[in-house]
C-alpha cells in the first residue's frame, strides 16, 4: 500500500482509530437554531465517514448556556441535543469511523448578542477592536464552569461519541486563562504557569470523572499564539507536557489566536503543513498521540509527517470539505481524482463568520449531501459552451445524472480565467483544482471538443435539447476612459500568460484583486511596479487573510500605490486621473514615464453589453428560438467570484 503509515490503526486512550485521517472540528452552521444537529449535519458528517476518514470531530459545541458564539451553534449544556447527536454517531459508526466532539466556551471570542448574556474571560480584555469587553470570571464561577465541561462530556458519551476534545486554543475561554497575554488575574487562577493551567486541569478532572474512562479525552491547543507576550512554541511544549500529566489521552495541535487568523485559516499562498515543525517540537515532549493540522491537502505529505514521527495523525480540514472521499481515493491510489482545497476561504470561513451554512468553491455538493444527486428523469442532449470551471462543473454534474453531454472550448486549454488565477505568487494550487475537474469530466465520459467555437448555425444543425452557456468573462474595458483602446496597453491576462512583452517600469491600472495580484506577479519578477485604483485602498475585494500576505509582498517589493484616483485617460506611458475622494477637486493629475501600462480593472461577461442601464444577453437571446432550454452560468451572466460560478453551474445541471 502506498500510504501504509496513514492507513495503520492507532490507539488514543480507550479508542481505536482505523487510520490516521482526521476531520477536525470546523464551524459549518448546519445545526438548528435550538442547538440540535440537523439532518444536513447528519448527512455532512456521514459523507466524510463514507469517504473513510478514521476520526471525525464534530464542530465546536457549546458547553455553557449563555456562551453561544453564533446562532447555528450546536449545544450540549442540556439533554436536548443528545438524540440528534446519536444520529450523527450512528451514521459515522456504520462506516467504521470514530467520532469525537469538540467542547467549547467561546469566552472573549464570543458575542453577547448571540449568547444572550455577557461573555466571559479570564480577564476583562476585549479580544480585538470592536469586540465585546468580557466580564472577568469570578473565582467561584471558574469551578462551576469546569463542571459544565464534565456534564457536556457525559452527554456526548450518551450521544454515542467515542471521544471529546476540549477546546483550549485560539483565544477562547480556556486559552484566555492559559496565556499571560490575556490572564492578568492575581487569584489561584493567575500569575505563574501552574495557576494559569489550573482551569485546564480542573476541566480534565471533571471530564474524566463524568466519563469514567469510557471515552478518549483530547485537548486542542495552539503550537504558538503568534502574538508578542503570548504563548510561543517553547511555552506550548510545556503546556502539552502538563496536559499529559493531567491525564489527557491525545493532543490536537493548531495555531494562533484570532488576531492572527491568517495562521488559523491559512489562505492561498500558505503551504500545506506550514506549522509542521512547531507540532513536531510538541510531539517530542509527550508520549500521547498528536494530531497535526494546517492546510494539509495531499496524502503524500501526510504520510511523510507520520513516517518521520512528527505527528501521529493528520487532520485534513478544508480538504475534507473539498473532497470528503480523500482517504478512500488515497487508499485506491486515485490521486488525480482528488479535488484539492485551494484555500480560497470564500465559502467556508466567510460564511461561517456570516452565520450562513458553509459552502465550497471546488465542491458545490457541500451542504447538500442529504439531497444526493438524482438521476435525470429523461436523458437529454446537453451542450456546454465554455471550458472554465463553471462549464466543467456543469458538464460533469449533468453527465453523472445521465445526460449526453458535450463540452466545447474555444481555445486549446481548459480552465478559463481560473487557470490564469493560478499564475500570481502563491496561487499555484489552483491548477490542481482545474486538473481535477478535467479528470472528472474525462472519466465521467463527457465528450470534450477543444478549439471549437460554437455558432447558432451549428446548434440549428445539431439540435441539442439544452445549452449551458459558460463562456466566462473578458477584460473589462470602460469606453468612457480616453485612450483605453490604445494598442500599446497590455491586458492583465496577456501579462500573466506571457503573450505580450513587458517593460521594466510598469503601471497597473486597477487595484482590485486582479490588478493587485498582477502587480505582485510582476514585482516578484523584478519589475518596478506602481498600481492605481479608484477606491481608497488596494485589494478591498481580496479575502482578509490573503490580503495580509499580499500587502506584505507590496511592502517587500516597494510597489507604489496610488489610491482614490479616477483614471480619465490612458497613455502609452501612464495615465491622467482625478481625485475620486474629493469631487470638488477638478485638478487633472498625471503619472507618466512607464515602459508598460497594464489594464487590470476586472472582467465583464463575454456575451453581455450594457446600453445605458439595460443588460442584453446577445447570444442567449439568439439561441432561445433554436434550443428548447438555454441556461447561463458563472461569469457569462456577470463577472463574479468563482464560488458563485460553480454553485450556479451545479444547480443548473441539477435541474436539467
Regions found by a protein language model. Give the residues of each.
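Flavin-dependent oxidoreductase catalytic cores
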Residues: 1-385, 389-400, 404-405, 413
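Glycine/Thr-rich phosphate-binding loops of Rossmann-like dinucleotide-binding domains
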Residues: 32, 66, 174, 227, ...
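Internal hydrophobic alpha-helix adjacent to the cofactor/substrate pocket in enzyme cavities
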Residues: 323, 328-329, 520-531, 643-656
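Rossmann-like NAD(P)H-binding beta-loop-alpha module
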Residues: 387-400, 503-527
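Glycine-rich FAD pyrophosphate-binding loop
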Residues: 403-417, 527-538
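A Rossmann-like FAD-binding core segment of flavoenzymes
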Residues: 431-476, 484-504, 524-619
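A conserved FAD-binding loop/helix module that cradles the flavin
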Residues: 518, 542-543, 609, 633-656
Amino acid at each position: 500500500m502506498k500510504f501504509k503509515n496513514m492507513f495503520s490503526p492507532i490507539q488514543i486512550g480507550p479508542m481505536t482509530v482505523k487510520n490516521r485521517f482526521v476531520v477536525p472540528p470546523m464551524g459549518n452552521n448546519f445545526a438548528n437554531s435550538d442547538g440540535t444537529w440537523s439532518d444536513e449535519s447528519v448527512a455532512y458528517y456521514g459523507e466524510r465517514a463514507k469517504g473513510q476518514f478514521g476520526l471525525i470531530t464534530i464542530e465546536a459545541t457549546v458547553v455553557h448556556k449563555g456562551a453561544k458564539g453564533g446562532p447555528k451553534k450546536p449545544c450540549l449544556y442540556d439533554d436536548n441535543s443528545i438524540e440528534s447527536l446519536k444520529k450523527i454517531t450512528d451514521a459515522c459508526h456504520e462506516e467504521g469511523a470514530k467520532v469525537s466532539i469538540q467542547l467549547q466556551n467561546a469566552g472573549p471570542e464570543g458575542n453577547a448578542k448571540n449568547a444572550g448574556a455577557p461573555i466571559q474571560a479570564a480577564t476583562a480584555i476585549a479580544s480585538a477592536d470592536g469586540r465585546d469587553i468580557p466580564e472577568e470570571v469570578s473565582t467561584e464561577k471558574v469551578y462551576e464552569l469546569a463542571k459544565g465541561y464534565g456534564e457536556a462530556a457525559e452527554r456526548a458519551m450518551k450521544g454515542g461519541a467515542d471521544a471529546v476534545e476540549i477546546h483550549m486554543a485560539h483565544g477562547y475561554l480556556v486559552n484566555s486563562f492559559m496565556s499571560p497575554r490575556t490572564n492578568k488575574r492575581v487569584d489561584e487562577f493567575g500569575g505563574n504557569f501552574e495557576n494559569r493551567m489550573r482551569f485546564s486541569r480542573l476541566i480534565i478532572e471533571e471530564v474524566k470523572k463524568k466519563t469514567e474512562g469510557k471515552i478518549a479525552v483530547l485537548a486542542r491547543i495552539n503550537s504558538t499564539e503568534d502574538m508578542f507576550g503570548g504563548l510561543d512554541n517553547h511555552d506550548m511544549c510545556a503546556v502539552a507536557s502538563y496536559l499529559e500529566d493531567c491525564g489527557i489521552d491525545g493532543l490536537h495541535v493548531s495555531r494562533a489566536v484570532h488576531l492572527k487568523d491568517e495562521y488559523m485559516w491559512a489562505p492561498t499562498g500558505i503551504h500545506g503543513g506550514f506549522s509542521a515543525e512547531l507540532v513536531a517540537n510538541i510531539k517530542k515532549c509527550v508520549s500521547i498521540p498528536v494530531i497535526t493540522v494546517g492546510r494539509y491537502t495531499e496524502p503524500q505529505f501526510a504520510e511523510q509527517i507520520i513516517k518521520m514521527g512528527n505527528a501521529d495523525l493528520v487532520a485534513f480540514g478544508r480538504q475534507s470539505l473539498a473532497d470528503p472521499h480523500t482517504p478512500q481515493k488515497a487508499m485506491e491510489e486515485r490521486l488525480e481524482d482528488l479535488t484539492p482545497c485551494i484555500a480560497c476561504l470564500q465559502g467556508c470561513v466567510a460564511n461561517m463568520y456570516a452565520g450562513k451554512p458553509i459552502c465550497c468553491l471546488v465542491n458545490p455538493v457541500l451542504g447538500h449531501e442529504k439531497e444526493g444527486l438524482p438521476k435525470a428523469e429523461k436523458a437529454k442532449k446537453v451542450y456546454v459552451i465554455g471550458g472554465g470551471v463553471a462549464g466543467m462543473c456543469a458538464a460533469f454534474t449533468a453527465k453523472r445524472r445521465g445526460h449526453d453531454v458535450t463540452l466545447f472550448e474555444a481555445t486549446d486549454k481548459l480552465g478559463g480565467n481560473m487557470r490564469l488565477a493560478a499564475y500570481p505568487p502563491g496561487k499555484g494550487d489552483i491548477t490542481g483544482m482545474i486538473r481535477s475537474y478535467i479528470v472528472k469530466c474525462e472519466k465521467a465520459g463527457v465528450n470534450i471538443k477543444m478549439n471549437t467555437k460554437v455558432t447558432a448555425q451549428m446548434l440549428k444543425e445539431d439540435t441539442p435539447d439544452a445549452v449551458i452557456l459558460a463562456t466566462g468573462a473578458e477584460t473589462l474595458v470602460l469606453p468612457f476612459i480616453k485612450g483605453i483602446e490604445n494598442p500599446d496597453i497590455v491586458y492583465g491576462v496577456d501579462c500573466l500568460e506571457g503573450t505580450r512583452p513587458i517593460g521594466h517600469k510598469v503601471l497597473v491600472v486597477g487595484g482590485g484583486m486582479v490588478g493587485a495580484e498582477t502587480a505582485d506577479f510582476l514585482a516578484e519578477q523584478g519589475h518596478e511596479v506602481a498600481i492605481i485604483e479608484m477606491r481608497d485602498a488596494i485589494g478591498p475585494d481580496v479575502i482578509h487573510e490573503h490580503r495580509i500576505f499580499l500587502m506584505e509582498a507590496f511592502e517587500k517589493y516597494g510597489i507604489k500605490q496610488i489610491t482614490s484616483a479616477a483614471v480619465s485617460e490612458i497613455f502609452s506611458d501612464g495615465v491622467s486621473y482625478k481625485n475620486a475622494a474629493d469631487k470638488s477637486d477638478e485638478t487633472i493629475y498625471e503619472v507618466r514615464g512607464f515602459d508598460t501600462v497594464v489594464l487590470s480593472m476586472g472582467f465583464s461577461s463575454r456575451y453581455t453589453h450594457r446600453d445605458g442601464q439595460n443588460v442584453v444577453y446577445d447570444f442567449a437571446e439568439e439561441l432561445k428560438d433554436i434550443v428548447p432550454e438555454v441556461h447561463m452560468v458563472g461569469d457569462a451572466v456577470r463577472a463574479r467570484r468563482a464560488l458563485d460560478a460553480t454553485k450556479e453551474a451545479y444547480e443548473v445541471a441539477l435541474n436539467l
